[in-house]
Amino acid sequence: MAWNTNLRWRLPLTCLLLQVAMVILFGVFVRYDFDADAHWWTERKHKNLSEVENEFYYRYPSFQDVHVMVFVGFGFLMTFLQRYGFSAVGFNFLLAAFGIQWALLMQGWFHFLEGRYIVVGVENLINADFCVASVCVAFGAVLGKVSPIQLLIMTFFQVTLFAVNEFILLNLLKVKDAGGSMTIHTFYAYFELTVTRILYRRNLEQSKERQSSAYQSDLFAMIGTLFLWMYWPSFNSAISYHGDSQHRAAINTYCSLAACVLTSVAVSSALHKKGKLDMVHIQNATLAGGVAVGTTAEMMLMPYGALIIGFICGIISTLGFVYLTPFLESRLHIQDTCGINNLHGIPGIIGGIVGAVTAASASLEVYGKEGLVHSFDFQDFKRDWTARTQGKFQIYGLLVTLAMALMGGIIVGLILRLPFWGQPSDENCFEDAVYWEMPEGNSTVYIPEDPTFKPSGPSVPSVPMVSPLPMASSVPLVP
């Protein structure tokens, strides 16, 4: 089918309306929190506080790292498609910029409402980045198959559902999930896989050539992987309690990521008949350990336990890219462009299960009395809880997350199927030239034009595409 991809009026109006709405809502609801307010100086003198006791100095280094992950790490990780680099980085930038504003509001209404105002400080910025990181994860499943308007609409609903699910897990079920294995990775992976199933494209084979990578595009994607890998310890520890919990979260993530690299490389080589490595596995499966250790990051997992998690996830994630992704596409019609099920979905579920087991097995011998109370917040509402009770509620949290993801994905997928969002035709997926002004000599694909907003009859055959980037297979080998 041919679609009208001319967004001259629709995209500007959508962006401007959303931003005007954000300005109005921020004006009505949002104010600085105490540590960011000018009145802090008065309180500082009254309580004899030091400047370094401001929350900013504790949290901002972690915020910087998470911010880099969202805009550089996830953005460049998706540049592996040979003709979709502009869109991968540019659309990631767009949806993240909108998402952090909407996340500050949605999370503020659930968690940071004081009277009639949402108070915003550096911890809010970290939580908003967490929310947007999950949106970037979800973007990977529909990469190359949706319009920027669809991405903005999807971000609006995703952030809303994320805030609701996060509130249920953290506030009602009292789940521990410092690194977001459940609230971030599991939720958005299966939310977006459900959306992808509903947006199934029967003739996507027509764009199969552009769905592959090139030597340069894989190199750019590897830059994204390295940024994510380096900063993931900050991601998993960013909102943990100061002191031992935050320290432990960084160590556990560090160990899990390291083990994951070795097993990913081992399995990738073992599955190739000549023992060669697949760059897709190295770009993605090497990060699965950081995803899976998220829930248990601040628990007394022990370094060897973190290594075991990374070891297992490196194997499972790589096997998923080789066997599970093709199965999902051919049998279940789930067209997962980036393989987010293997990097985020399955490792997220593993993380949720390991978190439940680790919580249920917590003991006074391992944590100490004060440490157990502090680590699991066994006070007030939870003062009569045992470690087994905590483990049971961790499982409830995982089940609620999966249910929310599936139901939300169905609803949002049906909305995105409407024909007036400017989505590309099947023969023009994974192509920057559909939505971007390309440098001279690079735009060689024919883009069908349809003056209506509805699908037309049989699609116009496209002119054969000439890629400006050499395919990996066509790069001459140096003897």
From Swiss-Prot:
Record PTM text: N-glycosylated.
Gene Ontology terms, MF aspect: ammonium channel activity; ankyrin binding; carbon dioxide transmembrane transporter activity
Side Cytoplasmic, residues: 1-9, 82-85, 145-148, 201-218, 272-281, 325-345, 416-479
A Pfam family hit: Ammonium_transp
UniProt membrane topology term: Multi-pass membrane protein
Reactions it catalyzes: NH4(+)(in) = NH4(+)(out); methylamine(out) = methylamine(in); CO2(out) = CO2(in)
Compartment(s) where it occurs, according to its Swiss-Prot or TrEMBL record: Apical cell membrane
Glycosylation site positions: N48
Chain segments annotated as transmembrane: 10-30, 61-81, 86-106, 124-144, 149-169, 178-200, 219-239, 251-271, 282-302, 304-324, 346-366, 395-415
UniProt topological domain (Extracellular) ranges: 31-60, 107-123, 170-177, 240-250, 303, 367-394
One BP annotation, GO: ammonium transmembrane transport
Domain of life: Eukaryota
Keyword terms, alphabetized: Ammonia transport, Cell membrane, Glycoprotein, Membrane, Transmembrane, Transmembrane helix, Transport
Annotated function: Ammonium transporter involved in the maintenance of acid-base homeostasis. Transports ammonium and its related derivative methylammonium across the plasma membrane of epithelial cells likely contributing to renal transepithelial ammonia transport and ammonia metabolism. Postulated to primarily mediate an electroneutral bidirectional transport of NH3 ammonia species according to a mechanism that implies interaction of an NH4(+) ion with acidic residues of the pore entry followed by dissociation of NH4(+) into NH3 and H(+).
Similarity comment: family membership: Belongs to the ammonium transporter (TC 2.A.49) family. Rh subfamily.
UniProt subunit comment: Homotrimer.
Name of the molecule in the record: Ammonium transporter Rh type C
Gene expressing this chain: RHCG
